[in-house]
């Protein structure tokens, strides 16, 4: 039996975050504050000596991952499976614009993991496409948790994806998924996967160790 630590880090601030604009899979860049947030998170997480860093291929996540990689001499690989929720016709709109377009739907979507914006994904969809990323890491990293169980694999991604993947790994009832609230920019979650030395994803029992941890107190939870 061994314990595998999985850290999931949200990207730093973008202008869309600052403007309460829903990005989804639009490729947006970090602001100056976002770069500073990424550097602060990197300073803390580098001390954990990550064994692997896998990032969404969207710029805001990749640049956040690069800040960490530069501090711990680990290269960054990317996986499209870690992209943010596709928000369909809501992408690029502010919260107010979405509420005017579809009154009540944004709150309903937040409260129900099975709902998706028109042309977009539900949280169930997001979990289904991101779980294989973790399964692939288990296959390709047989020493994960064997040499030093505190050395994590770090996924750098997006708030919606992190919440969906966390809920799925914890095997929460779908109607309880919204209990996981928003994450601040450059904040992270940590899960521990308990299972046999040679394990597939379904063999692990996951526990939530940390949610919305940050190098600094933040009021940007969106």
Residue positions per predicted region:
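Loop-to-helix element that buttresses phosphate recognition and phosphoryl-transfer chemistry
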Residues: 7, 13-68, 114-131
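GST superfamily/GST-like fold recognition
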Residues: 159-163
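Phosphate-coordination/substrate-recognition cap region in phosphate-metabolizing enzymes
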Residues: 39-106
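Short, conserved phosphate/pyrophosphate- and ester-handling motifs at nucleotide-, phospho-/glycolipid
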Residues: 11, 158
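Acidic, low-complexity terminal tails and accessory targeting/binding regions
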Residues: 1-4, 74, 88-97, 139, ...
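Active-site signature of alpha/beta-hydrolase-fold catalytic machinery across serine-
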Residues: 67, 164-168
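Extended, charge-rich low-complexity interaction segments
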Residues: 108-118, 215-222
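Short glycine-rich phosphate-binding loop at a beta-alpha junction
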Residues: 50-57, 144-148, 152-156
């Amino acid at each position: 039996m061994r314990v595998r630590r999985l850290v999931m880090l949200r990207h730093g601030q973008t202008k869309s975050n600052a403007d309460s604009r829903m990005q989804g899979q639009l490729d947006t860049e970090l602001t100056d504050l976002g770069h500073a947030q990424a550097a602060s998170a990197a300073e803390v997480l580098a001390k954990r000596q990550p064994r692997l860093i896998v990032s969404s291929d969207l710029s805001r996540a990749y640049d956040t991952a690069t800040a960490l990689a530069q501090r711990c001499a680990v290269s960054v690989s990317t996986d499209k499976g870690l992209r943010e929720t596709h928000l369909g016709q809501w992408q690029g709109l502010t919260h107010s614009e979405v509420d005017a377009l579809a009154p009540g739907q944004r709150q309903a979507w937040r409260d129900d993991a099975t709902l998706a914006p028109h042309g977009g994904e539900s949280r169930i969809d997001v979990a289904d496409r991101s779980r294989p990323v973790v399964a692939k890491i288990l296959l390709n990293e047989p020493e994960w948790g064997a040499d030093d169980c505190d050395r994590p694999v770090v996924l750098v991604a997006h708030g919606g994806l992190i919440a969906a993947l966390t809920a799925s790994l914890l095997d929460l009832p779908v109607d309880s998924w919204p209990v996981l609230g928003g994450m601040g920019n450059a904040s992270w979650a940590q899960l521990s996967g308990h299972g046999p030395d040679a394990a597939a994803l379904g063999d692990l029992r996951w526990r939530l160790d940390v949610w919305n941890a940050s190098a600094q107190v933040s009021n940007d939870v969106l």
